[in-house]
Amino acid sequence: MRVLLSNDDGVHAPGLKALADAFEGDEVWVVAPDREQSASSHAISLHRPLRLFEMAPRWYAVDGTPTDAVYMGLNHVLRGARPDVVVSGINHGPNLGNDVLYSGTVAAAMEGALLGVHALAVSLACSPPHVFDEAARFAVALARRVVATQPPAPLLLNVNVPRGPVRGYRFTRLGRRTYGNEVVEKTDPRGRKYYWIGGEGGPTNEDIPGSDCNCVLGEGLVAVTPLHLDSSHDAVLQGLRSWTVPGYEKEPAL
């Protein structure tokens, strides 16, 4: 099995190393950001050149975002030798609920799916200290299942693994997490103001049965959540079709 690994914690992150070690015996390629890129979402570098550094055989760093790294991996490093699966992670912390909108880990996997390759985003959903062995083993087992099944369309799975031995898993939907809206204002030694967004403390998780948040944080199970590349809101679309905008002609729905 040919595997492309990436992440958003950077090419030297221990979660990435644990994932590469767990795929021992497979053809593993690593193309990852050269530094920490957490919460970079799906940013891509279109207005500056990228640099690619070969750190070791089949192990590359890109001075860009997680999306840049996977794009470079599929369209340059592995051009003509398409991988069977892209795996992003292991993230140092959870990517649950609306975290996926901000996550560079999820974005790296999503870029793989957008480019036609089955992809997994894998996160260790706990605070430090991080021990990645169980999450890495589960990721490998799930990746093998995906490759063996070969779904007809590129599959994108968001995986969150709790701390400790894996005692079970569940296929889930996304939950909802609420973060603080505080903006903390401070002053640097030169008298200039600077700001931290989000404030202090962790998120509040809504109690939604069947959600990834409940599964991981409430029950201690691995959550595997399929994500969809089409962000259209079909239920709202049906309602909008009855609207009229004054002064403009509405064309028939297709």
From Swiss-Prot:
Cofactors (names): a divalent metal cation
Cofactor: how bound: Binds 1 divalent metal cation per subunit.
Catalyses which reaction(s): a ribonucleoside 5'-phosphate + H2O = a ribonucleoside + phosphate
Main location: cytoplasm
Major enzyme class: hydrolase
EC number(s) from the headed UniProt entry: 3.1.3.5
Pfam families given in the database record: SurE
One GO cellular component, as annotated: cytoplasm
Keyword Nucleotide-binding on entry: yes
Annotated GO MF terms: 3'-nucleotidase activity; 5'-nucleotidase activity; exopolyphosphatase activity; metal ion binding; nucleotide binding
Keyword set, alphabetical order: Cytoplasm, Hydrolase, Metal-binding, Nucleotide-binding
Subcellular location per the Swiss-Prot or TrEMBL entry: Cytoplasm
Highest taxon listed in the record's lineage: Bacteria
Binding of a divalent metal cation, residues: D8, D9, S38, N91
Function: Nucleotidase that shows phosphatase activity on nucleoside 5'-monophosphates.
Record-stated family: Belongs to the SurE nucleotidase family.
Protein name in the entry: 5'-nucleotidase SurE
Species assigned in the record: Anaeromyxobacter sp. (strain Fw109-5)
